[in-house]
UniProtKB/Swiss-Prot annotation:
Origin species: Nostoc sp. (strain PCC 7120 / SAG 25.82 / UTEX 2576)
Family annotation (Pfam families): CpcD (PF01383)
Disulfide bonds: none
Gene name, Swiss-Prot/TrEMBL: apcC
Keywords assigned: Antenna complex, Membrane, Photosynthesis, Phycobilisome, Thylakoid
Topology with respect to the bilayer: Peripheral membrane protein
Origin: domain of life: Bacteria
InterPro entries, per the entry: Allophyco_linker, Allophyco_linker_chain, CpcD-like_dom
Protein name as it appears in the record: Phycobilisome 7.8 kDa linker polypeptide, allophycocyanin-associated, core
Signal peptide extent: none
UniProt domain CpcD-like: residue ranges: 2-57
């Protein structure tokens, strides 16, 4: 069982804009493996996004995540 982070982020979407001044933001939630967290964090920030919430998640509810 691998440790996962459940992240909620906000990234500006340039593909959905109708005019130059309008900027549409896209919210998304995804599970990211513990090992890939830093890479994912860099990707979101380079795209001009903000990480709103980070939670530790496991595959099953009630499973010990191994934090002590």
């Amino acid at each position: 069982m691998s440790r996962l982070f459940k992240i909620t982020a906000l990234v500006p979407s340039l593909s959905r804009t109708r005019t130059q001044r309008e900027l549409q933001n896209t919210y998304f939630t995804k599970l990211v493996p513990y090992e890939n967290w830093f890479r994912e964090q860099q990707r979101i920030q380079k795209a001009g996004g903000k990480i709103i919430k980070v939670e530790l998640a496991t595959g099953k509810q009630g499973t010990n995540a191994g934090l002590q």
